[in-house]
Amino acid sequence: MALAAAAAAAAAGVSQAAVLGFLQEHGGKVRNSELLSRFKPLLDAGDPRGRAARRDRFKQFVNNVAVVKELDGVKFVVLRKKPRPPEPEPAPFGPPGAAAQPSKPTSTVLPRSASAPGAPPLVRVPRPVEPPGDLGLPTEPQDTPGGPASEPAQPPGERSADPPLPALELAQATERPSADAAPPPRAPSEAASPCSDPPDAEPGPGAAKGPPQQKPCMLPVRCVPAPATLRLRAEEPGLRRQLSEEPSPRSSPLLLRRLSVEESGLGLGLGPGRSPHLRRLSRAGPRLLSPDAEELPAAPPPSAVPLEPSEHEWLVRTAGGRWTHQLHGLLLRDRGLAAKRDFMSGFTALHWAAKSGDGEMALQLVEVARRSGAPVDVNARSHGGYTPLHLAALHGHEDAAVLLVVRLGAQVHVRDHSGRRAYQYLRPGSSYALRRLLGDPGLRGTTEPDATGGGSGSLAARRPVQVAATILSSTTSAFLGVLADDLMLQDLARGLKKSSSFSKFLSASPMAPRKKTKIRGGLPAFSEISRRPTPGPLAGLVPSLPPTT
């Protein structure tokens, strides 16, 4: 009796009028988390076996009076312009004696009207549609004397927008052959139950446990749930664990945001698929639900709101890379445009200015934004990690690179996602001053070259290979010059008549006296061999020297 009283109190608090009033009190729009936190205690009160039925009924109430709209990644429950008419209250949520009250024969056929003799089978009609073991609830309660009237099941067919069938059409549909009444394959436990048993097909109100076998035969009376409804049933255990079975710490703002959005997507099933940001949060579910897990800062979700006209015009004009009066006017009206990024490349307006080499655009952007109180990040990175200084060096705009470093204070040690600094994108013909300004480590210990390109610094500023080639070429030219002078001197000596004094001058050595050639004792001297007559056939070919006197 205590559980029944609690269920009745919960039913009185959870109604379509209560949901409608709650939305109207909050201006017609409320977060899903606030809506669930308001009605969750009432849904959890009472018999635990009827919790699923109360939750389904609550979702039907919300669908009747509101829709879901997603703003900036957060789903809001927004009041409908024309709410749907409420359905009659179920018998399990009312007093125990309400099941015995007669109802009109032409009333809407609902699984909770148990007045007619054929009403108890209708109460249990859509139960086989649910997957077995979905919520861990028994098919029929065994401890309540009310029988079918006290069963807390809620058919998912109630959520369909099809008009209800009259009692006459329902009676005709129950007499159709079983070819149209095949149960869905999602109920394997009921596949063996017979579909034709005339004696048990029409039990009275007192027969509470007789006709469980006739559930598949009654399925064609209701419309088959849509695929979205079946997906909702499959995903419902996750929401049940979050709401009731596994209490988790509710103090974390990140966890509250995740639970609120997942409850809207899984529990109510009122909106489309979740965003990529929410899928990333779902993959971290065990870490977020654990009270001992360390909270990680989440990346800001991408904006789902389309661009305003001024933002679109700003992105289009800044991509041209030229400073115009239109850009100046847009920046004066909205100072936040200076930090607006292109959604494809991640470029800001300063990136486009550096890429095109327009120093005036870069200066005006920074100065106007600073005067407006919104300083520009000179070292902002694009999606590839490029800063404006990287782009200026990559496209060979030396003036823009010097302006970014000297005037705007850009950092030269920032690396992109490839690990490269700005000097590594300089072209081969870049100046020495720019390389030194960007911190090229290959220029350490060198001096700046002269204005004419010569001097001692010109040799040191070159690469080692070029230095070696220069030294080799200069040495070779000097050696060839000395050799040429020597040859000219010999030609001059041959042209002159050799006098005794001049011969002595040429033969005399200024350094030291000439050493005599040592002659080995065992071998004859060359002079002796040359004086001997040549025997054989070579006697006429090799001349012999005249004998010395």
Curated annotation (Swiss-Prot):
Signal peptide from the UniProt entry: 1-17
Keyword set includes Iron-sulfur: no
In-chain residues carrying the UniProt-annotated modification Phosphoserine: S260
Stored SUPFAM superfamilies: Ankyrin repeat
Biased composition range(s): Basic and acidic residues: 235-248
Region Disordered, annotated ranges: 82-219, 235-256, 513-549
Gene3D superfamilies, sorted: Ankyrin repeat-containing domain (1.25.40.20)
Start and stop residues of the ANK repeats: 345-374, 384-414
Keywords noted in UniProt: ANK repeat, Phosphoprotein, Repeat, Signal
Record family assignment: Belongs to the SOWAH family.
UniProt protein name: Ankyrin repeat domain-containing protein SOWAHA
Organism the protein comes from: Homo sapiens (Human)
Annotated gene: SOWAHA
